[in-house]
C-alpha cells in the first residue's frame, strides 16, 4: 500500500491537475472539481436516495463536488424534478447524501439557485407568473421551449428574495454541506439583474452597473453574514449569453463583481465560466478571457467551460486557475481523476440522457476503469 501511495504521489507531481491545494480552510488532494450539473432526478423537488450513488461515485478523498443547482424557494423552479433546500423535508433528504460524500473524504458544496424568468407558470406556486428583474419574456428559440411572461419584482419585494437565499444557505449548513455556491450565472435570476440586456429597471436595482449588481451583492452580504465568508463561493458567467441575458461590457461587469467579493476577507472561491472556446487548427482552445478576473480576485479561482485534460493541466501550471470544474466529462466518467492520472480514454457522454428522469440510465450506469488495471492510480 505504501508503494502504491508513493507511485500515486509521483504521478500526481507530474500532473498539475492532481496536485494538492489549500482552499481556505479546506485541504484538497487534487484540483478536478465536479461542476454543478442539473440532472432532473429529484422527484417533487426532493433529493432522492439514488443521488447517494451518483455523488459518491464521483467523490474522492480530498476532492471537491458542487451539487446540481438547488432551488431556494417555491418560486425558484423552472425545470422538472430539480432539488430544493427551502423545506425541512428537503434538508432531511440531503443529509444522507452529504454524509455519504463525506464518508468518501470529499468536500461538498450546495449550489443555491433561483431561475427567475427561466420558468413557466406550471412550475410556479398557484400558477403565478415567474418573477424577474423585468416583465420582458425570453425570446423563444429553436428548442421549442416557450417561457412564460415574467412579473417584474417590486422594489419592496426584493428583500424577501434575498432572505430566501439567506435561509437556503442556513439550511445547507444544517444539512451538513461544507459551504454554498451562489448561482450568479447562465441567465438565471441574479444575472437577470446584473446584465443590461435583461435589466430595464429604473429603481435602485437598475440603470448603472453598481445598481444592477446591487441585488446580487446584497445576496452575497446576507449569506456571508449568515454562514461566514469561508463557506461561500459564487459562480459567474459575464461573457455568456444564455436565456437572452447578455451584457454590453462583460469585463467591467466581471471586474466589478470580483471587487465586491474581495470586500469579504476569506471568501471561499470565485467560479467563472469561460467565453466560447476558440477553434484553432481544429482544436478547441482556451481564449483566456478570464485572466482579468483571475488577477483581480484575492482568493481561490475556479475556471470552467469545456476543458479537457491537456487544457486543464495547462491552466493550472500557468497559474491561470487554481481549480478546474468539469461537467460533461465528470458526468460520463465517475472516476475522472483516476483517468487523468494515467491518461486513460474517457467514456463518451450521452446528451440524450442528461435530463431524463430515470434514476439509473445516464446517471449511475457510466462504467469505471477496470479496478484491476495495474497502472491505475488510486484516486477513489
Curated annotation (Swiss-Prot):
Keywords: Fatty acid biosynthesis, Fatty acid metabolism, Flavoprotein, FMN, Lipid biosynthesis, Lipid metabolism, NADP, Oxidoreductase, Oxylipin biosynthesis. InterPro entries: Aldolase_TIM (IPR013785), OxRdtase_FMN_N (IPR001155), Oye-like (IPR045247). Substrate binds at residues 183-186, 276. The keyword Lipid biosynthesis applies. It holds the Pfam family Oxidored_FMN. Belongs to the NADH:flavin oxidoreductase/NADH oxidase family. Putative oxophytodienoate reductase that may be involved in the biosynthesis or metabolism of oxylipin signaling molecules. This is Putative 12-oxophytodienoate reductase 4.
Amino acid at each position: 500500500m505504501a508503494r502504491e501511495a508513493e507511485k500515486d504521489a509521483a504521478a500526481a507531481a507530474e500532473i498539475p491537475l492532481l496536485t494538492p491545494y489549500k482552499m481556505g480552510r479546506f485541504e484538497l488532494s487534487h484540483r478536478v472539481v465536479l461542476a454543478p450539473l442539473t440532472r432532473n432526478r429529484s422527484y417533487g423537488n426532493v433529493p432522492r436516495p439514488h443521488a447517494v450513488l451518483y455523488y459518491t461515485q464521483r467523490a474522492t478523498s480530498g476532492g471537491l463536488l458542487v451539487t446540481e443547482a438547488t432551488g431556494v424557494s417555491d418560486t425558484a423552479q423552472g425545470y422538472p424534478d430539480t432539488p430544493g433546500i427551502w423545506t425541512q423535508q428537503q434538508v432531511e433528504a440531503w443529509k444522507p447524501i452529504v454524509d455519504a460524500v463525506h464518508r468518501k473524504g470529499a468536500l461538498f458544496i450546495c449550489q443555491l439557485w433561483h431561475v427567475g424568468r427561466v420558468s413557466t407558470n406550471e412550475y410556479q406556486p398557484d400558477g403565478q407568473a415567474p418573477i424577474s428583474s423585468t416583465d420582458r419574456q425570453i425570446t423563444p428559440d429553436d428548442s421549442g421551449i416557450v417561457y412564460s411572461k415574467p412579473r417584474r419584482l417590486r422594489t419592496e419585494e426584493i428583500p424577501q428574495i434575498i432572505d430566501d437565499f439567506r435561509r437556503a444557505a442556513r439550511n445547507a449548513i444544517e444539512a451538513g454541506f461544507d459551504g454554498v455556491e451562489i448561482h450568479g450565472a447562465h441567465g438565471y435570476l441574479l444575472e437577470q439583474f446584473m446584465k443590461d440586456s435583461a435589466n430595464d429597471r429604473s429603481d435602485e436595482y437598475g440603470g448603472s452597473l453598481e445598481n444592477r449588481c446591487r441585488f446580487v451583492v446584497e445576496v452575497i452580504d446576507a449569506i456571508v453574514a449568515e454562514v461566514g465568508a469561508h463557506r461561500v463561493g459564487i459562480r459567474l458567467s459575464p461573457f455568456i449569453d444564455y436565456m437572452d441575458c447578455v451584457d454590453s461590457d462583460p469585463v467591467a461587469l466581471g471586474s466589478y463583481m470580483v471587487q465586491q467579493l474581495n470586500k469579504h476577507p476569506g471568501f471561499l472561491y470565485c467560479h467563472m465560466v469561460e467565453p466560447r472556446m476558440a477553434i484553432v487548427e481544429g482544436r478547441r482552445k482556451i481564449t483566456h478571457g478570464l485572466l482579468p478576473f483571475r488577477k483581480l480576485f484575492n482568493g481561490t479561482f475556479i475556471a470552467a467551460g469545456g476543458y479537457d485534460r491537456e487544457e486543464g493541466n495547462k491552466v493550472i501550471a500557468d497559474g491561470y486557475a487554481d481549480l478546474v470544474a468539469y461537467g460533461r466529462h465528470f458526468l460520463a466518467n465517475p472516476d475522472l481523476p483516476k483517468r487523468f492520472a494515467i491518461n486513460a480514454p474517457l467514456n463518451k457522454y450521452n446528451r440524450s440522457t442528461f435530463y431524463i428522469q430515470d434514476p439509473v440510465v445516464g446517471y449511475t450506469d457510466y462504467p469505471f476503469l477496470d479496478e484491476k488495471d495495474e497502472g491505475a492510480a488510486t484516486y477513489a
